[in-house]
């Protein structure tokens, strides 16, 4: 008797339940509670909190290097966004975990409000200067109406690209992991030796996905800082 199991390739992106607790809720709560844990609340921080403080200082130095002092008040917000995205990305690599940042509903919920706030602040502080960016310097008079439309569209495309880049890269990586792990499972049941090269590729790909999870969190926050630097 042969039993057939049908597995959807996109089924891993649907939230599972553990003890009647939705895994999507668990992953988001874990990412947010992680912030409260890593920030020291006592006079003598622990060894882990000291290591985290050094890591946070290095991240802030990478993101805020060669920047104006006007962006300093935004350091706390950008650092928090980085921690939340990094925690959700890494947590999604665990088996049966829900990758919240692979859904554009979450990535747009993070990117669009920040982009909107930054641009509203930019137009409020320097309205004429922001309008002048819609027409690049040296543009012929005949092309000014066209350039205004192009620059306006590129401006509104920023939050779309910001959220879509994060979700698409994580989705692609998880699909590759799913396909390779399925191939290993099918080959190991028939011929163990043939699954060894695929397993080696799988391990290397998983290590690469850990790096992608960290890099995507950095790219998201670096782009947010870039948009902030254009407006403040």
UniProtKB/Swiss-Prot annotation:
Localization (cell): Mitochondrion inner membrane
Keyword Transferase: no
A Pfam family that the UniProt record links to this protein: ATP-synt_A
Gene3D superfamilies linked to this entry: ATP synthase, F0 complex, subunit A
Keyword Ion transport: yes
Keyword entries, A-Z: ATP synthesis, CF(0), Hydrogen ion transport, Ion transport, Membrane, Mitochondrion, Mitochondrion inner membrane, Transmembrane, Transmembrane helix, Transport
Transmembrane segments: 18-38, 74-94, 107-127, 142-162, 173-193, 195-215
GO molecular function annotations of the record: proton-transporting ATP synthase activity, rotational mechanism
InterPro entries in the record: ATP_synth_F0_asu, ATP_synth_F0_asu_AS, ATP_synth_F0_asu_bact/mt, F0_ATP_A_sf
UniProt superkingdom: Eukaryota
Topology relative to the membrane: Multi-pass membrane protein
GO CC terms, sorted: mitochondrial inner membrane; proton-transporting ATP synthase complex
Broad class of the protein's primary localization: mitochondrion
Family, as annotated: Belongs to the ATPase A chain family.
Subunit and partners: F-type ATPases have 2 components, CF(1) - the catalytic core - and CF(0) - the membrane proton channel. CF(1) has five subunits: alpha(3), beta(3), gamma(1), delta(1), epsilon(1). CF(0) has three main subunits: a, b and c.
Function, in words: Mitochondrial membrane ATP synthase (F(1)F(0) ATP synthase or Complex V) produces ATP from ADP in the presence of a proton gradient across the membrane which is generated by electron transport complexes of the respiratory chain. F-type ATPases consist of two structural domains, F(1) - containing the extramembraneous catalytic core and F(0) - containing the membrane proton channel, linked together by a central stalk and a peripheral stalk. During catalysis, ATP synthesis in the catalytic domain of F(1) is coupled via a rotary mechanism of the central stalk subunits to proton translocation.
Protein name: ATP synthase subunit a
Species whose genome carries this gene: Paracentrotus lividus (Common sea urchin)
